[in-house]
């Protein structure tokens, strides 16, 4: 197994470690969750970079790298729903609509549905001996998801070790989280729609 593929596989293990930390009763569980998720993000950056530099791109990596990303980010969003049961104070009011820096269930439904649709398309392509690689705008989507998740984790972990940081984040931290979540939602839906449109011949010919 090549080094990039080992890094990709390690992301599955780091995702499991992240979920354990999220739901453990350790006094530093938020910090551990943040560390594990950041390490998983580093492997996502390194596996692609090393594969391109050393010309170690394989069909395994093309398929499993985006799958590892999807499992990592979707697991994190679902876990954050479980953790953030109480809605924080809203930071923006639009008439009767109040927006809070929280991962809502309907957001995760959209994100997971998009990822399942793209995974289904890749499986359909594989059945036709076609390998669909991740595209640049898909990577931008993944980065935006990671930024939103890390922002939420930092807000939680700061209460364990850095009370001064939590106090410093209060004026603008919730605004950043809210913006990151909505940017993530926009990139997730738009990139998914564009990917399905560009590869429409794969599924339209079977309709």
Where are these regions (language model features)?
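Hydrophobic alpha-helical transmembrane segments of integral membrane proteins
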Residues: 1, 12, 62-65
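C-terminal membrane-associated helical module and adjoining short loops/tails
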Residues: 1-5, 14-15, 34-37, 41, ...
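Core segments of transmembrane alpha-helices
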Residues: 10-17, 68-80, 114-119, 141-153
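Cytoplasmic juxtamembrane interface segments
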Residues: 11, 109-132
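Membrane-embedded alpha-helical segments that form the functional core of polytopic membrane enzymes
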Residues: 16-63, 74-84, 95-112, 172-189
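Hydrophobic alpha-helical interface/terminus motif in multipass membrane transporters
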Residues: 51, 77-81, 121-125, 196-199
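Juxtamembrane "helix exit" motif at the C-terminal ends of alpha-helical transmembrane segments
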Residues: 81-89, 157-159
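Intrinsically disordered, low-complexity domain-flanking/linker segments in eukaryotic proteins
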Residues: 87-99, 164-169
């Amino acid at each position: 197994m090549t080094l990039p593929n080992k890094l990709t596989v390690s992301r599955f293990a780091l995702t499991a470690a992240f979920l354990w930390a999220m739901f453990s009763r350790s006094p530093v569980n938020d910090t551990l969750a943040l560390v594990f998720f950041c390490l998983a993000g580093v492997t996502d950056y390194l596996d692609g970079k090393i594969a391109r530099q050393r010309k170690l791109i394989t069909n395994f990596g093309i398929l499993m790298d985006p799958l590892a990303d999807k499992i990592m980010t979707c697991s994190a969003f679902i876990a954050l729903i479980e953790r953030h049961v109480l809605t924080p104070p809203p930071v923006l009011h639009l008439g009767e609509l109040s927006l809070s820096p929280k991962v809502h269930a309907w957001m995760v439904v959209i994100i997971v549905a998009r990822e399942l649709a793209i995974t289904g398309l890749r499986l359909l392509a594989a059945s036709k001996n076609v390998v669909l690689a991740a595209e640049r705008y898909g990577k931008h989507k993944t980065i935006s998801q990671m930024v939103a998740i890390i922002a939420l984790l930092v807000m939680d972990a700061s209460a364990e070790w850095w009370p001064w940081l939590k106090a410093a984040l209060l004026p603008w931290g919730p605004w950043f989280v809210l913006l990151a979540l909505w940017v993530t939602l926009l990139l997730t839906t738009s990139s998914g729609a564009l990917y399905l449109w560009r590869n429409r011949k794969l599924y339209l010919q079977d309709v």
